[in-house]
Swiss-Prot record:
Keywords tagged on the record: Leucine-rich repeat, Repeat
InterPro entries with a match to the protein in the record: F-box-like_dom_sf (IPR036047), F-box_AtFBL13-like (IPR053781), F-box_dom (IPR001810), FBD (IPR006566), FBL13/AtMIF1-like (IPR050232), LRR_dom_sf (IPR032675), LRR_FXL15/At3g58940/PEG3-like (IPR055411)
Domain F-box residue range list: 17-63
SMART domains named in the record: FBD, FBOX
Superkingdom per UniProt: Eukaryota
Classification lineage: Eukaryota, Viridiplantae, Streptophyta, Embryophyta, Tracheophyta
The name this protein goes by in its record: Putative F-box/FBD/LRR-repeat protein At5g22610
Domain FBD: 384-435
One Pfam family per UniProt: LRR_At5g56370
Mapped LRR repeat ranges: 70-98, 99-127, 147-180, 181-206, 208-228, 238-263, 344-373
Length: 502
């Protein structure tokens, strides 16, 4: 009986296998395309019918580290590309992750040349592992620059040489990501960017290379991210002087909407023709230094003026230090379109409440402000007087939302900043405070109670308090017998705590 059941199961499985195997190769390749590349290749051992089906897949993600030896990977790639060239001209997407040693052969240039001559639309080439050292990197072929079908390109730790600048590069390319590469010279990189006539999204992450001045001139670009990756000594071989003394960044892109700086180390920044700018994000350290003929203040003024038409602005602690230093000598350019500002701040409450009104005066139409603060409280008469002496235009007209996250649990400088907004904002609708539970357990409930009981200039203003660590809202409950108000909150372990605040 059991033998009959087993035979029937085998027959049913074979029938199912036969049904799948009889599907057209085009349909089979579409089904396989939803699997990881490793599993796709494994189907080649199922039967003779499946031996070459995986070679018809339009997109593959190949990692040399998943092969027992690099030579095995080389043989596999050579066979695959030969078949692709002869039988599968519809390879549209390819990612190559290369990890090799000093004795491994250099084949990536040839492979890239092969796929660039087809109908490729997405190409991602990256060198990792031991290949951090530049002598292991490989040169991209000239055929890549003239690939007519390529839409998306990512190159990570490769060498890019000169090319024919009289020919439009990559005529269909929409998105390009260049990370930690080495270029033949500055002019070559500049020409590569400007000759991509329909390029919309560009990301550049630089290292200590031979490109001192990065120039981005584009009539089509809508999104740009510029970053810098530094390595500690011993991590990578340095081939160029690490001193960025005469480094610079030039951006001229009239259609640019989104601009991101991520640890940008260029000393001078020239930004022009950015009338379409919507959002600027400044992450990590940023350098704005004096250059020949211009003081640091003048360079900062040029940079701030260049981004002054933005609607959404996110700035790091380092950028806030630049702004703070600038405000000591001059007022900021007017950010007339700015409606959303997010800033990380590390200052005493005295210093921050000194620059905050000056900062807000340059944002007459600001609607929302989010502050991640590390403000050390400084309760002095001067602080109080300064807090109420200056009321910027946006507080009297447009500001509706304030969020403050306190990153220090032992100080209540963030509450001093919150007090400024609550006392002076005419149309404020909501104030959100994100505080550490340890802050609330260290005798600061009275300070919080003062904030909650402040006379609010806006009758619509609501104040919400959250535990910054777990996002739980803090509740206020009134004892029916004593009339006292209790503050309930949860710590990281979500244990219950209660504190009397009145």
């Amino acid at each position: 009986m059991e033998e009959n059941i087993e035979k029937r199961i085998c027959v049913e499985q074979l029938a199912i296998e036969d049904l799948i195997s009889k599907l057209p190769e085009v349909l089979l390749s579409q089904i396989l395309s939803y699997l990881p590349t490793k599993d796709i290749v494994r189907t080649s051992v199922l039967s003779k019918r499946w031996k070459s089906v995986w070679l018809l897949i339009p997109g593959l993600d190949l990692d040399s580290s998943e092969f027992p030896h690099y030579d095995t990977f080389v043989d596999f790639m050579n066979e695959f590309l030969f078949f692709s060239r002869e039988e599968n001209p519809c390879l549209h997407k390819l990612k190559l992750s290369i990890q090799k040693n000093e004795n491994d052969p250099s084949c990536v240039t040839l492979w890239t040349d092969c796929v660039a001559r087809g109908k490729l639309q997405h190409l991602d080439v990256e060198f990792g592992g031991r290949v951090m050292e530049r002598e292991f990197w490989e040169m991209m072929p000239l055929s890549l620059y003239i690939c007519k079908t390529l839409l998306h390109l990512r190159l990570y730790r490769v060498l890019l040489g000169n090319f024919d600048q009289s020919v439009d590069s990559l005529p269909s390319l929409k998105s390009m990501c260049l990370e930690e590469n080495v270029y033949s010279n500055e002019a070559s990189l500049e020409s590569l960017i400007s000759s991509c006539r329909v390029l919309e999204d560009l990301t550049i992450v630089k290292i200590d290379d031979n490109v001192r001045f990065l120039r981005v001139h584009s009539q089509s670009l809508t999104s740009l991210s510029v970053g810098y990756k530094s390595y500690y000594p011993g991590e990578i071989y340095y081939y160029y002087d690490r001193d960025r003394g005469n480094s610079g960044l030039v951006i001229d892109a009239p259609r640019l909407k989104y601009l991101t700086f991520n640890n940008d180390q260029s000393k001078s920044k020239t930004i022009s023709n950015l009338g379409s700018l919507v959002k600027v994000t400044i992450l990590g350290p940023i350098k704005i230094s004096r250059v020949v003929g211009c003081t640091e203040q003048q360079m900062a003024h040029k940079f701030l003026t260049g981004i002054s038409r933005v609607r959404y602005l996110i700035v790091s602690e380092d950028m806030m230090e630049v702004i703070s230093s600038y405000l000591k000598e001059d007022s900021l350019p007017q950010f007339g379109n700015l409606s959303y500002l997010k800033a990380s701040v590390w200052l005493s409450s005295f210093d921050f409440l000194d620059i905050l009104p000056k900062l807000l005066e340059s944002c007459p139409n600001l609607k929302s402000i989010v502050l991640e603060t590390t403000c050390i409280v400084d309760r002095t008469k001067a602080t109080v007087e300064r807090r109420v002496s200056s009321v910027p235009e946006c507080l009297l007209s447009s500001l509706e939302f304030v969020e403050i996250k306190n990153r220090i649990s032992v100080d209540d400088g963030a509450l001093e900043v919150a007090r400024y907004f609550v006392e002076n904002s005419v149309n404020l609708q909501k104030v959100v405070l994100r505080l550490a539970s340890s802050f609330l357990r260290r005798g600061n409930q009275a300070v919080l109670k003062d904030i909650l009981e402040l006379p609010r200039r806006s009758s619509m203003c609501q104040i919400e308090v959250f535990n910054a660590l777990n996002g739980h809202a803090l509740c206020f409950r009134k004892n029916k017998i004593t009339g006292r108000v209790f503050l309930d909150y949860f710590d990281v372990a979500e244990s219950y705590y209660g504190a009397i605040v009145s």
